[in-house]
Amino acid sequence: MTIQASSGPSSALEAVLADLITVHHELLQLVREHRVAISRNDAAAIQELLSRQGMLGVRIAALEKARGEAIRAITGSARAGITEVLSKVEAGDRAGVAAKAEQLRSVLMEVQRQNGIVRAATQSLLGHID
């Protein structure tokens, strides 16, 4: 994690978003490996990948807490949406925060899509067991 003292709440938010992007890319890679392990019916690999995904979940939770704190520093509410956040950050910081938020949204959508594929593959495998 690169959470560190920064020149202001906008910089802190941008750093947290960058870390969230990195961790979610790591998660995406694990989900893809999970899909391959399912296709090979490799129980040991599946177990190991689930464990690693769980560890990333802990990192994501810590980053989400930091993200909420940065958003609270900007807007007064940890749950403010990106539109409100962007309306309250300084103009010079707006483009960077918006770009990171969009990158995070994009990787989250891909993680969700890949998780759907893994879920379907798991159900298919379980169907063969029944």
Predicted regions and their residues:
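C-terminal-biased regions
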Residues: 1-36, 43, 47-130
